[in-house]
Amino acid sequence: MANTLEQLKSYTTIVADTGDIEAIKRYQPEDATTNPSLILKAAQIPEYSALIDNAIAWAKLQSTDIEQQIDDASDKLAVNIGVEILKLVPGRISTEVDARLSFDKEKSIAKAHKLVRLYQEAGVDKSRILIKLASTWEGICAAKELEQEGINCNLTLLFSFSQARACAEAGVYLISPFVGRILDWYKKDTGKDYDAVNDPGVVSVTEIYNYYKQHGYNTVVMGASFRNIGEIIELAGCDRLTIGPSLLEELANSQLAIQPKLVPTSTTVAVAEPLTEAQFRWEFNQDAMAVDKLAEGIRNFAIDQGKLEVMLKAKLAN
């Protein structure tokens, strides 16, 4: 019998949530996703030192201003890592816009344009890139404009139905609803443990998936942020699942037989009027978990971006 990972691949597109080339070679995902935390982690890998050196040298040629050099080196490094990953996956790479721009639509769009340009200069067509943006109102509005330009987006840090609905209404290519971080919040808030079927993160993604299919939205649902393989197995059949190396390994070593749990419905429900900004903000604000986890996620990505920039600044000074 095929291992659990191979079975899962027959129902769901598997994406590697890592910047680690060796892990990607091992598990042969369709796509890969990165974020500031994963780029920081990848930057510690000795095999990537040449990519960092290239980013530093390139940044020095762009500007004499140290702050601009740091910004350029950071973007170039993310793209360099993405280019290497694209040599190994047949699909797409997700590269994230600086989390500190999460509440600035125009600067998010400008950063997306810069990342796409850097990929194109490295010989990568925009059809192989997803621009990752936080699922704030501003991030969703930025994605709407980028999608209209033909730049596909991955809306991340998504914890609530209101965020998912707004993304679909904006015509976003793909969303990354988080599973494990939702579970973390509820375990801390209630003091309870949850089995996979009743896991609040699994329930959330299932609701979003069913809503999208019932309403005929084309936005891809890619479950993200997993704590255990039970969550993953309960979401078999989801459009895509992005999974970290440790859980990919666990799935590859498992012989558990699985069946699809998420199945697209054939009934189409009439689409409601799109959420206004005021409606979105009110509905989102009513979800204490989503408010907490979005804010925390943005802060933590910004912290790791800052750590990466400290490392790059030291190298730029040499």
Curated annotation (Swiss-Prot):
Signal peptide: none
Any one biological process term the GO annotation gives: carbohydrate metabolic process
Keyword Cytoplasm recorded: yes
Subcellular location: Cytoplasm
Reactions listed under catalytic activity: D-sedoheptulose 7-phosphate + D-glyceraldehyde 3-phosphate = D-erythrose 4-phosphate + beta-D-fructose 6-phosphate
Alphabetical UniProt keywords: Cytoplasm, Pentose shunt, Schiff base, Transferase
Associated pathway: Carbohydrate degradation; pentose phosphate pathway; D-glyceraldehyde 3-phosphate and beta-D-fructose 6-phosphate from D-ribose 5-phosphate and D-xylulose 5-phosphate (non-oxidative stage): step 2/3
Family according to the record: Belongs to the transaldolase family. Type 1 subfamily.
Name of the protein this chain belongs to: Transaldolase
Organism of derivation: Shewanella oneidensis (strain ATCC 700550 / JCM 31522 / CIP 106686 / LMG 19005 / NCIMB 14063 / MR-1)
